[in-house]
Amino acid sequence: MAAQPRGGDCRGFVLLSILLGTPWEAWAGRILYSVSEETDKGSFVGDIAKDLGLEPRELAERGVRIISRGRTQLFALNQRSGSLVTAGRIDREEICAQSARCLVNFNILMEDKMNLYPIDVEIIDINDNVPRFLTEEINVKIMENTAPGVRFPLSEAGDPDVGTNSLQSYQLSPNRHFSLAVQSGDDGTKYPELVLERVLDREEERVHHLVLTASDGGDPPRSSTAHIQVTVVDVNDHTPVFSLPQYQVTVPENVPVGTRLLTVHAIDLDEGVNGEVTYSFRKITPKLPQMFHLNSLTGEISTLEGLDYEETAFYEMEVQAQDGPGSLTKAKVLITVLDVNDNAPEVTMTSLSSSIPEDTPLGTVIALFYLQDRDSGKNGEVTCTIPENLPFKLEKSIDNYYRLVTTKNLDRETLSLYNITLKATDGGTPPLSRETHIFMQVADTNDNPPTFPHSSYSVYIAENNPRGASIFLVTAQDHDSEDNAQITYSLAEDTIQGAPVSSYVSINSDTGVLYALQSFDYEQLRELQLRVTAHDSGDPPLSSNMSLSLFVLDQNDNPPEILYPALPTDGSTGMELAPRSAEPGYLVTKVVAVDKDSGQNAWLSYLLLKASEPGLFAVGLYTGEVRTARALLDRDALKQSLVVAVQDHGQPPLSATVTLTVAVADSIPEVLADLGSLEPSDGPYNYDLTLYLVVAVAAVSCVFLAFVLVLLALRLRRWHKSRLLQASEGGLASVPTSHFVGMDRVQAFLQTYSHEVSLTADSRKSHLIFPQPNYVDMLISQESCEKNDSLLTSVDFQECKDDVPSIQQAPPNTDWRFSQAQRPGTSGSQNGDDTGTWPNNQFDTEMLQAMILASASEAADGSSTLGGGAGTMGLSARYGPQFTLQHVPDYRQNVYIPGSNATLTNAAGKRDGKAPAGGNGNKKKSGKKEKK
């Protein structure tokens, strides 16, 4: 409650002097309230919200609270009403003893702006204490010859209350021998004295009993009594006398317990019992007997407990000396306690932030504390310091308040916890200090993006990997903490060969493990460029990127593919021509193969596995060239079969084989003449041919043996002439259509027909039979076979000879002329200047087959001009089609041919570096064959 007016002091109002200033600045005035002691808990003291210019609800919002400097909290704030109320029972005498005015001061802290407001509350005394005597029995000895009017001091009563509530009067029970006199001391204390009114007579009454009553001025007044026992003794005409009316001593507060402080001394001139003096305390508080000891015989005063300047700096007491009969006198004792530096400074935290964000601006207040030292003077002067290497500084506020503020930017990643040591030192000698540690946690903010150890990575994975296999572990680091350091991984959206990157690989968003979603094929995909993004979980989130190159490593999963000679589709056997005049080292043909793999897996080597005539042919290990190993002999068979293996150098190695049929002859007529010794290949066409022959022979033999033979010969002769005429005129209408076998968009090389020559021994007539083809150089399609009228064609050589003048070969079409370099073969063995392309459609294929058939017909007539040089298969330059590897797939670059300069290019060249021989030589040989 507010202080009430008292006397002329106008304190019936609350004095509020407020000077507005910057945060942390002190108010120039103080707020004064008053409250009576012993009020109930929660009693109203003052409207603090109104006096601070706030609404009650703002007390909690702005963090208004009481700071009491370590003393027991006597007051509290009512957050609802905005009032200052009592926190419990208040005892004025306990707080201020007998001080005339009892003020309790504390501060109000407004935390939002760190403002301090000093508050004073005056504790109003109430009459809650009864005057009490030090002892309830007072013994007084009076000589019987004592004259009336003599005064005998009595023990006074004490009342802790002040003002009118303190001790005001004494009363003595009615008695005819005694009266009561009251004396007042300099400090206003009242001392009762017993006045002798009439002479005592010991023989009449030895003991007198009186009652002394002490009363205060409260409303209602309170009182207590003490019993006085007056003993009448014999005459004692001297009283003790102290050597000094007042004794003074000054001692330091740290004197040991039991130290003698001083000695009081009184003299009594009487002798015997009347002269024996005893000492005792007269006017002391209840606490003094616990602090000091007075030797009743010697008058020595010593300490019973340690002195504490901070509790009591000055003691005042009275001692009395009494002789045997009871005469007494009194003296005052003053003890002054000197302060020594025995208390270290104390640090009291008023406001402290246990955690601050790392982006806190400079000058932010993070702590408010109060320094105090219970010592006085220089011993109580306190200074405070912190280490210099910290991003903080101390600023002094009002009284002994200090604030701790930031001076530099904080970085949690550099230092996340600060141990701030506050060292408070007093000015004593020697100085005392105390350290207080403040642990300041720096809260993280998302100021660091995730980082990868490297900006790019190269990862290698073998092809044919299993789906779902882990490829690589991507890791990123974030120097932040908690959610700000929680990283998730993702792949940037992109397309690879028209498909999204997510169809190739995936990434675990938590662990960063890359997984392959499909089995990679080196031949289709050799490299993937990925971009991995790492995001943290901060607000806002930060991210960084990393590029990853995923290289697919080749495995030996593709066997070599043979481009030449091309594998036929109808079961026929390929054939190459080797002249009998060929010398050792003559290039017969070249096996061309490629491997879709790369590196060692595509490094091919060639090996002759099997040959019908061992030692006759040799195959280049790295070139695939089939050459004669020795000169050809007459005993060497016309048909030579070679099995060539092509093997790569992978682990394990893969291989492919091809069977070559080499005809040993100088020209096609010679081949046609000697073809009877060659066994036709087993196939469906040969089976049908045999059946037709058997049926024809049986029919002729059984029914029309002679007639049918003649008639059939004539019919066949006419039919054959018409065919030759058509062929010589360039019509080529009856030439069967052939198809070529393709491999990887590369057309197969030209195939040749297999011929069987049947020579009868009985006449001039011989039959040249053209059965189903079985040579590698030409294939007859099923469609062509079905269009022919018959499968056998007979030619009478004698009749043809007679009819030569009537059958003239038409001049060849110049559009069909080809250079010698255009014969079937590989680009690596051709050195001609002309270049050409593979047949790329059915029309070109049929045209080439027609040329081959025409040349074969001329050779059968003996007037062929197709005599070829060595290795030309009897074809002249004009009919030698140009075949190169221009259209070989791109993987031909993978072919390694160690030890050779030959490469798979489009450049044409000569077969063996020799010019083709003229056609006349072959014609002569053909003539010889006819004579046979």
Curated annotation (Swiss-Prot):
Residue intervals on the Extracellular side: 29-692
Bilayer topology: Single-pass type I membrane protein
Record field: transmembrane: 693-713
Domain Cadherin: 29-133, 134-242, 243-347, 348-452, 453-562, 570-682
GO cellular component: plasma membrane
Region (Disordered): 804-841, 902-932
Cytoplasmic-side segments: 714-932
Function: Potential calcium-dependent cell-adhesion protein. May be involved in the establishment and maintenance of specific neuronal connections in the brain.
Descriptive protein name: Protocadherin gamma-A7
Gene that produces this protein: PCDHGA7
